């Protein structure tokens, strides 16, 4: 009887221990890290309309129209720590919902603040963008302040069509250009998800998945719109 009781208690202990471990794993999978040295606190999304002028001897205006979405991610230190940001990697970009018109490109900053993307041509949609920790934010050099800062990138929707006109008018790059092409909001809406990996100076990495719907709904009417996203309850960071 005593031997049976010992075996029963032993196996009961094993079962309880396994249940506790399983509960911890499930809870971590659902909630992620409770205490992060750095976290994503805000995303600023700016949706606008751009155009590239084509030389055309027959028309005053011949403009290739592009809808662009600038993304600025704010990374803040969340606790008293001596850790700093070593690097932040944006990877595994996935188009969850493709637009009906246009082709998506992902661009990195290559210029100063006044012309961040003027010379940006390489498409990073099937690649990754890595910001190194530095003294200050420098998007052109892909550097983010190592105590927290802002990083940026752009999703552009190219090949929407050409605006051709012989009116001697000033061109305003806003939603009217999309209207003139007969482009509707529903035709250019798309959704992209990607992983953000924050690596600290202690070589500890935390990964979360972010999803962004673009462009902002008011782009057709307002032409240039911005939106702040601060609810990240669905972005779960885990150690990797």
Explain the meaning of each model-derived region:
Residues 25-187, 201-240:
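Non-catalytic macromolecular-recognition regions in eukaryotic signaling proteins
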Residues 1-17:
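N-terminal Sec-pathway targeting helices
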Residues 16-27:
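Hydrophobic alpha-helical membrane-insertion segments, chiefly the h-region
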Residues 1, 198-200:
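Hydrophobic, Leu/Ile/Phe/Ala-enriched alpha-helical segments that form helix-helix packing faces
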Residues 190-198:
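Short, structured surface segments that line ligand/substrate-binding pockets
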């Amino acid at each position: 009887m005593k031997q049976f009781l010992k075996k029963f208690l032993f196996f009961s202990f094993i079962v309880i221990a396994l249940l506790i471990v399983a509960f911890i794993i499930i809870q971590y999978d659902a909630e992620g890290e409770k205490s992060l040295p750095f976290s994503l606190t805000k995303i600023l999304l700016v949706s606008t309309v751009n155009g590239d002028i084509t030389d055309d001897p027959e028309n005053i205006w011949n403009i290739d129209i592009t809808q662009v979405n600038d993304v600025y991610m704010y990374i803040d230190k969340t606790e008293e720590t001596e850790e700093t940001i070593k690097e932040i990697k944006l990877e595994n970009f996935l188009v969850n919902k493709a637009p009906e018109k246009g082709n998506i490109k992902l661009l990195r900053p290559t210029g100063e603040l006044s012309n961040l993307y003027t010379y940006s041509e390489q498409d990073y949609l099937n690649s990754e963008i890595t910001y190194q920790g530095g003294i200050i934010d420098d998007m052109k050099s892909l550097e983010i302040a190592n105590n927290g800062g802002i990083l940026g990138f752009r999703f552009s929707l190219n090949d929407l069509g050409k605006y051709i006109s012989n009116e001697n008018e000033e061109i305003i790059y806003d939603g009217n250009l999309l209207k003139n092409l007969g482009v509707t909001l529903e035709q250019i809406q798309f959704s992209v998800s990607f992983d953000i990996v924050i690596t600290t100076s202690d070589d500890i990495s935390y990964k979360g998945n972010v999803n962004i719907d673009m462009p902002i709904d008011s782009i057709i009417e307002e032409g240039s719109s911005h939106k702040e996203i601060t609810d990240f309850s669905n972005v779960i960071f885990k150690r990797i």
